[in-house]
């Protein structure tokens, strides 16, 4: 019994050591808050691009909330096609809109009227998502149900957020947390 308890504690510690930490007092969050408050003062809608990775739970979040969360329309990046498939899509919306999608940084990754954040779930949540996906589907999509592949994509995404020991972009551990932070800062 004691040996199994020690093993469980060691596994939890290993998972925590592999995870990342962020502090919403970091200057990147202050800058984000100032941008969102400026948009509100200018009477512009909240337009938010959430960058994430494969297996982060984007589709589940959108479906679970019926494409609406805290007064914001939730848009799936995968539903758009063509050369204009970028955060510039948000400029067509006159009401609060959140575009959830891939973490690649394109030429539109710094539009003045679009706020950008990342969502990178904890390793524990990733493992839970993969287990649920594998449990509920008889024929698995090779990449989206492969924990090794998803963890690799997660690491690549974290490499965009943190570089050289500093945080470059706001990051949250869930879509709920990211949208809530931005909606509250904006004043939705």
Positions of the model-derived regions?
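The Walker A (P-loop) glycine that initiates the GxxxxGKT/S ATP-binding motif of P-loop NTPases
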Residues: 52
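Small-molecule kinase domains that catalyze NTP-dependent phosphoryl transfer to phosphate-bearing small molecules
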Residues: 136-188
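Walker A/P-loop
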Residues: 59
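Conserved substrate/cofactor phosphate-moiety recognition/catalytic segment
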Residues: 63-98
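Walker A (P-loop) phosphate-binding loop of P-loop NTPases
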Residues: 55
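N-terminal pre-Walker A segment at the start of P-loop NTPase domains
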Residues: 18-37
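Conserved phosphate-donor/acceptor-positioning beta-strand/loop module used by diverse small-molecule
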Residues: 112-130
């Amino acid at each position: 019994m004691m040996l199994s308890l020690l093993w469980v504690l060691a596994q939890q510690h290993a998972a925590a050591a592999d995870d990342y930490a962020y502090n919403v007092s970091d200057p990147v969050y202050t800058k984000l808050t100032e941008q969102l408050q400026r948009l509100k003062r200018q009477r512009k809608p909240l337009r938010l691009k959430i960058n994430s990775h494969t297996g982060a739970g984007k589709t589940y979040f959108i479906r679970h909330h019926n494409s609406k969360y805290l007064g914001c329309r939730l848009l799936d990046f995968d539903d758009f096609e063509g050369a204009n498939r970028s955060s510039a899509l948000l400029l067509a919306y006159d009401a609060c809109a959140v575009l959830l999608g891939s973490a690649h940084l394109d030429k539109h990754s710094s539009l003045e009227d679009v706020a950008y954040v990342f969502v990178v779930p904890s390793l524990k949540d990733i493992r839970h998502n993969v287990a649920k996906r594998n449990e509920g589907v008889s024929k698995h999509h090779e990449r989206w149900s492969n924990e090794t592949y998803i963890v690799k994509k997660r690491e690549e995404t974290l490499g965009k957020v943190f570089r050289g020991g500093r945080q470059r972009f706001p990051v949250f551990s869930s879509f709920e947390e990211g949208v809530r932070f931005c909606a509250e800062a904006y004043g939705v």
